[in-house]
UniProtKB/Swiss-Prot annotation:
Biological source species: Escherichia coli O127:H6 (strain E2348/69 / EPEC)
Lineage, top ranks: Bacteria, Pseudomonadati, Pseudomonadota, Gammaproteobacteria, Enterobacterales
Pfam families from the UniProt entry: Leu_Phe_trans
Locations listed in the record: Cytoplasm
Gene3D superfamilies: Leucyl/phenylalanyl-tRNA-protein transferase, C-terminal domain, Leucyl/phenylalanyl-tRNA-protein transferase, N-terminal domain
Protein name as annotated: Leucyl/phenylalanyl-tRNA--protein transferase
SUPFAM superfamilies listed in its UniProt record: Acyl-CoA N-acyltransferases (Nat)
Cross-referenced HAMAP family: Leu_Phe_trans
Amino acid sequence: MRLVQLSRHSIAFPSPEGALREPNGLLALGGDLSPARLLMAYQRGIFPWFSPGDPILWWSPDPRAVLWPESLHISRSMKRFHKRSPYRVTMNYAFGQVIEGCASDREEGTWITRGVVEAYHRLHELGHAHSIEVWREDELVGGMYGVAQGTLFCGESMFSRMENASKTALLVFCEEFIRHGGKLIDCQILNDHTASLGACEIPRRDYLNYLNQMRLGRLPNNFWVPRCLFSPQE
């Protein structure tokens, strides 16, 4: 197994099965963040993740962290909070603000560079990347974004500026996703936060099998239309 240098003249990727074991899942470097290359990557179970100043690095870890939306773990305290939630939740109202929020709300630094922001904004304009926004009155207080692959959603990042804001985004999205035929959320790499919400690890080969099936599925044509998903009770 060796790290592959991508060409700027081809959007082809090597097989994810050739990814390194250490660091886990590192597959290739280089290329660019063009919409065509990003979409090719997601279709093959690959995603970009790199630090500012480094070359673009492409990953496909084994195992893969996923969340079955019906298995989302909501604590009793969160259920109580949500019943009296002060938040309004929307979809695709403010993609730019959400990705900027994810980029700026990381005290330890972020991989979401200006180039990444611009790349995913282009994907959003093309109808492939989507955001969930959480509002307290007219203030954006949390949200999440990711890339759609049929009935599978590749979650990229989330942020929270007020209590339970990002959890609210995920909860409301999961409910809506399930209701309209969504099957699986890709969480990429398991961490304590996603594990606490019900994410689990599965072998990469299983994830790739799910991806190949689900990316051919379809949600309703109007699913990603900008709209309000949840409003606080009066």
